[in-house]
Each structure stands twice: as C-alpha cells, then as structure tokens.
From Swiss-Prot:
Annotated gene: panB
Gene Ontology, cellular component aspect: cytoplasm
Name of a matching Pfam family: Pantoate_transf
Organism: Heliobacterium modesticaldum (strain ATCC 51547 / Ice1)
Positions annotated to bind 3-methyl-2-oxobutanoate: D46, S47, D85, K115
EC number: 2.1.2.11
Subunit note: Homodecamer; pentamer of dimers.
Record-given protein name: 3-methyl-2-oxobutanoate hydroxymethyltransferase
Highest taxon, organism lineage: Bacteria
Cofactor or coenzyme needed: Mg(2+)
Protein's job: Catalyzes the reversible reaction in which hydroxymethyl group from 5,10-methylenetetrahydrofolate is transferred onto alpha-ketoisovalerate to form ketopantoate.
Keyword hit for Manganese: no
Amino acid sequence: MAKKITLPQCKEMKKQGKRLRMITAYDYPFARLVDESEIEIILVGDSLGMVVLGYDSTVPVTLDEMIHHCKPVVRGAPNTLVVADMPFGSYNVSKEDAIRNANRMLKESGIEAVKVEGGTRMAPTVRALVDAGIPVMGHIGLTPQTAAQLGGFKVQGKTEDAAQQLLEDALALESAGAFSIVIECVPAGLARTITASLSIPTIGIGAGPYCNGQVLVIQDLLGIYDRFVPKFVKQYAQTGPAIRAALNDYAREVADGVFPGPEHSFGMDDEMKGLY
C-alpha cells in the first residue's frame, strides 16, 4: 500500500517516467482491496451502469447513482486518489450545471476529481470547472456516453483527419486545465504521439503501451464476466468460474444437509442441554 498520490504528483510521475495505475471500483469491498494494493488511482466509472446496475449503456446512469457509489469507495480507499465520472447529462447542458453537479459529487461523496468525456468542444466546460476549483480528468477517443454518435464501440482516430482531431482535443483539454487525460480505443502510435505532445499524463485503455498509465474495469481484470472479453483486456484471474463453483458447492451442501456442520454451529452450556 503506497502513500496517497496527489494531483501534482501525477504530473511529476510523468516527468520521472513512472507509470500510473488506475482501476475502477464501485463499492466498499473492492475499494478496500484496491487500497491495499500498489494502484494509485480508483475511477468510479459510469461503467457501473453496465457492470453493476445492468443497463445496456452508461447513458441511463444518474448523478444520484454516481454519488451513491462514490461514497463507499471513498470510505474504503482512504490511501488512494478517487476520481469519478460525471454522468451523461450532468455536465453537457451548461457550464453552470456542470459546476453545480461536480460540486455535489465532491461535497457529498468525498471524491477528489471528476472525469468528463469530450475534447475541443468540452474544453470550455473543463476550464469553467477548473476555475471553480474542481480538478478534472479528460477523456478522448472512444467516449462511451456518445458511442452511438461515433458509430458504436469501435477504434477511433484511424484516419488522418480523425487522428489530428484527437491530438487537437488532447491539447485543448490540457490548455483548459485538465490534470490528466484518458485515451480510449485508439491506435497505439497515435496514443504515443498524443502522449509525447502533452505535459500532463495520459492513461490508456485500449490505446497501447505508450501512455503514461493504464486503466481497466476491475471486473474485467478479475475475469468475473467471461462471456465477452474486449481485445484490450488482460484477465489476471478467472474469478467468475470460481465464484459460480463456490455458489454451486454451497447450494449442494445445503440441499444435502452437509452445511452447516458441527464446526459452524453453536453449542449449549451443560446445564441447559437437558432442557432443549
């Protein structure tokens, strides 16, 4: 368990050539486990909509749902920097809305920074948030909240024009005051160029090895959901099958009267045994 990293230290780590490690968490138990690891940053992602709440996308996630999940994560990870996604509709209506809603997230949950999706068009909102004292992490490339507008969940920046736009997006977010930028699902060479063009750290997901850090969804990393594994995911464990096996063992032992056994039961004092 490392000492809690500060926002300025994120930038300093880039200068020193050190990699940032970020992982999602949505509840207290997983936050505790991450806090006991060497990972520096927890992202309470709006991916919880699909991973935890069973929605088809991140779009239905509400501000109240994000705050609800941020609270236990902050309590479970006192030694880890906690960043949270601003959900769709909470920051893209007006700058005033964005500031109001980001303030709610910080005040009510205890997170230290917010993440917003979008590039050049979102830069004025990022600047407004930063000027209001709210630290912001940017997010470019595949932006799940607007995936339909991008043609679905697919690699971005594959043409010269699209690649140039992503570079301009990153530079605009840096100029607006973002302390770091997530780059999602872009070619590795483009991510390398963007990373080299910025003084702030980039954190990749499906963006190759040249970013200043990496992020994964914790359920993907642990192999909990094994029906679909994105190309960019490495499963460091296969806990889904292990969990199912444990549940079936429990069900079988209860049905067979094996559990609970004597070792899981409470005894009675000698003077009471004859009464019951």
